Amino acid sequence: MISHFLNFLKFNGTPGEYGSPLWATVYILVIFGVASVAVMLMTYLERKVLAHMQIRLGPMRVGPHGLLQPIADALKLLIKEDIVPDGADKFLFWMAPVTVMMTAFTTYLVIPFGRSHAVTDMNIGVLFMIGISSLGVLAVVMAGWSSNSKYALMGGLRSAAQMVSYEVAMGLAIVSVLMMTSLQTGTGTLSMIGIVQAQQAQGSWFIFKFFPTGLVAFVIFAIAMVAETNRAPFDLPEAESELTAGFHTEYSGFRWSLFFLGEYVAMIAVSSIAVTLWLGGWLRPFPNALSGATWDFAFSVFPALLFFVLAAGCFIGWVRMPSKPAFKVQAIGLGIFGVLLGMIGAVLLIPAVRVRVSDIFWFSAKVGVFMYLYIWYRGTFPRYRFDQLMKIGWKVLLPVSLGVLIVTAVLGVRHELIAGLMGVAR
């Protein structure tokens, strides 16, 4: 078993390429666990960031600075009564939240967190991702229909109309990326890992390719992905001021928590897709401009140094904390947290760990920026009316995405012609 584990660590590929169902299963379980913990952390950060935007403190009661509030919320949801309304289609009512959660998690099968940190390198990864992510709206419509409530049904129908409006523009933006992958090889790729490798080979993230064409395509996808996940300011399917709670009005307890978990997991998933397609995926900043062993080492030890800085901050806070009985528990918790961060930083300095974790760190840092943008949007922009949302999708994003696709094709042909002429001249 140990030799099998060591052989897998030496293998520079995905578990699917290694041909081991065991390691593929382990990866799936790890992704499920990490994504669930990330959702808990995301809910805490969202409440804190929104509180600071509104000059409040946010959760402060449960744990130091409210750090244990997500755990308290999860336990509360698990022990709440689970009510099924009279007249509801019980089978569909039960299946809808499970389907929402499963479609969100299934997307992670093709998302590469690093060259060897993906469940599988599927050669139709982009097509698989688009198809699976589109299934979530069917579960939302299922929830609205099966609840036997006019508010829930309206929310489900809104979600379906919203998905149709924004999925087209999102798909065209993705097609422009697929066209960019074929510039040097002559044949594009639908592999998510292949798209990141194409950005590395061309020496540029696709957000900067054919500037500003790549940037416009990225902005279209960024807007569409907010609408795709039903987040503010495009949260019309669950508009509290109009539809009580939209498609999950009649849900409570554990089943409501599955909708909640699916929404946040989908947010992380679409952010990961945007990072993979336009921001170089797991590639560190400036991989071509700042190349060489020295720069590779400097960027690979950065995660460990960051954990050491965070640990130092915890110890400084521990020293400065008032020596009163009321602060004793917080002081102990802060000190233990600082020790854990320091231990993680020390482990990240081990060469074998440092090389593998560096990819995950840079990927996660980019995704974290998108998570902050989600919170920023919610605290800043008012909710659109439904007719305004439809108008943006059909009259703005769709024509612009078509224009971006045409311009990308023209510039790509021009690039290939110039490259061909230069090759003939040589």
Curated annotation (Swiss-Prot):
Its catalytic activity? Answer: a quinone + NADH + 5 H(+)(in) = a quinol + NAD(+) + 4 H(+)(out)
Keyword set, alphabetical order: Cell inner membrane, Cell membrane, Membrane, NAD, Quinone, Translocase, Transmembrane, Transmembrane helix, Ubiquinone
| Location in the cell | Cell inner membrane
- State whether keyword Cell membrane applies: yes
**What are its GO cellular component terms?**
plasma membrane
Membrane-protein topology:
Multi-pass membrane protein
EC number(s) on file: 7.1.1.-
Top-rank taxon: Bacteria
Any single GO molecular-function term of the entry would be: quinone binding
Q: Name one Pfam family in it.
A: NADHdh
Q: Does the keyword Electron transport apply?
A: no
Q: Which PROSITE patterns match?
A: COMPLEX1_ND1_1 (PS00667), COMPLEX1_ND1_2 (PS00668)
What are the TM regions of this chain, as residue ranges?
22-42, 91-111, 124-144, 163-183, 206-226, 258-278, 299-319, 331-351, 357-377, 392-412
Q: Which InterPro entries match?
A: NADH_UbQ_OxRdtase_su1/FPO, NADH_UbQ_OxRdtase_su1_CS
Predominant location of this chain?
Answer: membrane
A single Gene Ontology biological process assigned to it is: aerobic respiration
Q: Which family does it belong to?
A: Belongs to the complex I subunit 1 family.
Subunit info here reads: NDH-1 is composed of 14 different subunits. Subunits NuoA, H, J, K, L, M, N constitute the membrane sector of the complex.
> Could you tell me what this protein does?
NDH-1 shuttles electrons from NADH, via FMN and iron-sulfur (Fe-S) centers, to quinones in the respiratory chain. The immediate electron acceptor for the enzyme in this species is believed to be ubiquinone. Couples the redox reaction to proton translocation (for every two electrons transferred, four hydrogen ions are translocated across the cytoplasmic membrane), and thus conserves the redox energy in a proton gradient. This subunit may bind ubiquinone.
PANTHER family to which the protein is assigned, alphabetical: NADH DEHYDROGENASE SUBUNIT 1, NADH-UBIQUINONE OXIDOREDUCTASE CHAIN 1
Protein name stated in the entry: NADH-quinone oxidoreductase subunit H 1
